[in-house]
């Protein structure tokens, strides 16, 4: 299995994503936003940061980058796509995930560890966790308030698309939502950073199982 780690001007978690992929036992390669092909890749990791300086709004300019059409193609083919923080914002901007990310209710940038709950462990991203398991991931965002209409929220609930919730909501997200998947279950976006949660020495290794779950799910289908 080989992951593409997208790199935009202003990305600052691409190395963490690369390391997470390698640590999970697969290949990874950085892919510049100006590229026009993701041929040969089995999945996409869209890292956090401040793509294009968050001009217009977070993820807006990245959403029209040349590589995005290929991200949509891989998603349509059922390949795994994970967007974290700014990556989540990009996924909502390009329509692969519903809703939007707004400014935190506090209007402050939040950077700290947060306790989260796995509320759906029947996805390609969470199947190595226990249902209801509590995990610790770092958060680092100013625009992490997940917002959606009541209609979309009911669809998310009906389809079990909500996978991760905050135990102590730090940003005002609708129903404490921290992470969701698309209806097909192969595209995932979350504001917390599992790629920064790989070593107990650094405070938490709760994120290891998420990347291992992605690899496990892919291998079950292709090996």
Swiss-Prot record:
Ranges of residues in domain Glutamine amidotransferase type-1? 3-223
The EC number(s) this enzyme carries:
6.3.5.3, 3.5.1.2
Show the InterPro entries listed in the entry.
Class_I_gatase-like (IPR029062), PRibForGlyAmidine_synth_PurQ (IPR010075)
Pathway-wise, it operates in: Purine metabolism; IMP biosynthesis via de novo pathway; 5-amino-1-(5-phospho-D-ribosyl)imidazole from N(2)-formyl-N(1)-(5-phospho-D-ribosyl)glycinamide: step 1/2
List, alphabetically, the CDD domains matched. Answer: GATase1_FGAR_AT
An example Gene Ontology CC term for this record: cytoplasm
Its GO biological process annotations read: 'de novo' IMP biosynthetic process
Where, by residue number, is the active site?
A: 85 (nucleophile), 193, 195
Reaction catalysis annotation: N(2)-formyl-N(1)-(5-phospho-beta-D-ribosyl)glycinamide + L-glutamine + ATP + H2O = 2-formamido-N(1)-(5-O-phospho-beta-D-ribosyl)acetamidine + L-glutamate + ADP + phosphate + H(+); L-glutamine + H2O = L-glutamate + NH4(+)
| Cell location | Cytoplasm
**Gene Ontology MF, one:** phosphoribosylformylglycinamidine synthase activity
Q: List UniProt keywords, sorted A-Z.
A: ATP-binding, Cytoplasm, Glutamine amidotransferase, Hydrolase, Ligase, Nucleotide-binding, Purine biosynthesis
Cited PANTHER family: PHOSPHORIBOSYLFORMYLGLYCINAMIDINE SYNTHASE SUBUNIT PURQ
**HAMAP family per record:** PurQ
Q: What does this protein do?
A: Part of the phosphoribosylformylglycinamidine synthase complex involved in the purines biosynthetic pathway. Catalyzes the ATP-dependent conversion of formylglycinamide ribonucleotide (FGAR) and glutamine to yield formylglycinamidine ribonucleotide (FGAM) and glutamate. The FGAM synthase complex is composed of three subunits. PurQ produces an ammonia molecule by converting glutamine to glutamate. PurL transfers the ammonia molecule to FGAR to form FGAM in an ATP-dependent manner.
Q: How does it assemble?
A: Part of the FGAM synthase complex composed of 1 PurL, 1 PurQ and 2 PurS subunits.
Q: What is this protein called?
A: Phosphoribosylformylglycinamidine synthase subunit PurQ
Q: Which organism is it from?
A: Staphylococcus aureus (strain bovine RF122 / ET3-1)
